[in-house]
């Protein structure tokens, strides 16, 4: 604003100087200098990254944060924490659940996962497709599990259409295909190889303990 005012004043003076010869004598005294830049107070320059480094803040994945464990949860989500694609959806639900507090998240890939605490659902079974456990002990899976989970965080409308036929059956078929090939699509070993690796890891971690569960 100040720079534009100075330019306007200079232009007005020069114009009058041309029209009125009596002002020519002022030209030797009038020598405006516009080399100084005026920087508005409070203006901050944006710093660019140098040589490919990023200035974006490091965001801790929700998977690595302490998972909320609401006392009055309405549904428990059993998820595969080693699935990078799956974790995008899990992270979104975790964020939404911070407000609602109705979902309890259980990572089946954790060494602490216990089938006994989750209606007897073992690792291999839950790896086959998504499972969720309602507070009354009822187990839901597949598309229905997603629908119940989304409803608890205010996004029930996303899966509302799957309540109606034939859309519901079609959604189940599509999900079943995805669940069947999920490991290959995400570049992971077969379920047999994963189970064998978990078994070895359990042996190394637990030693001679009788309480470890595969």
Curated annotation (Swiss-Prot):
GO terms for biological process: tissue regeneration. Residues 1-49 form a transit peptide. One of its GO terms (cellular component) is mitochondrion. InterPro entries: DCC1-like, DCC1_Trx, Thioredoxin-like_sf. It comes from Arabidopsis thaliana (Mouse-ear cress). It comes from the Eukaryota. One of its GO terms (molecular function) is protein-disulfide reductase activity. This is Uncharacterized protein At5g50100, chloroplastic. It is found in: Plastid, Chloroplast. Keywords: Chloroplast, Plastid, Transit peptide.
């Amino acid at each position: 604003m100040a720079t534009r005012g100075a330019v306007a004043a200079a232009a007005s003076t020069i114009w009058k100087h041309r029209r009125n010869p009596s002002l020519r004598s002022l030209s030797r005294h009038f020598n405006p200098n516009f080399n100084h830049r005026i920087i508005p107070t409070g203006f901050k320059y944006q710093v660019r990254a140098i040589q490919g480094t990023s200035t974006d803040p490091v965001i801790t994945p929700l998977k690595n944060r302490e998972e909320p464990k609401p006392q009055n949860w309405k549904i428990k989500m059993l998820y595969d924490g080693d699935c990078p694609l799956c974790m995008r959806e899990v992270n979104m639900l975790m964020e939404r659940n911070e407000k609602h507090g109705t979902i309890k998240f259980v990572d089946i890939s954790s060494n602490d996962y216990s089938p006994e605490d989750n209606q007897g659902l073992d690792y291999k079974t839950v790896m086959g497709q998504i499972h969720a456990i309602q507070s009354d002990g009822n187990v839901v899976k597949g598309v229905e599990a997603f629908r119940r989970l989304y409803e608890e965080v205010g996004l029930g409308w996303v899966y509302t259409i799957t309540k109606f036929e034939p859309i519901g059956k079609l959604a189940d078929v599509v999900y079943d295909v995805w669940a069947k090939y999920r490991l290959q699509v995400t570049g992971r070993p077969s379920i047999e190889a994963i189970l064998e690796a978990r078994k070895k890891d359990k042996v190394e971690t637990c030693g001679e303990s009788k309480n470890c569960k595969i």
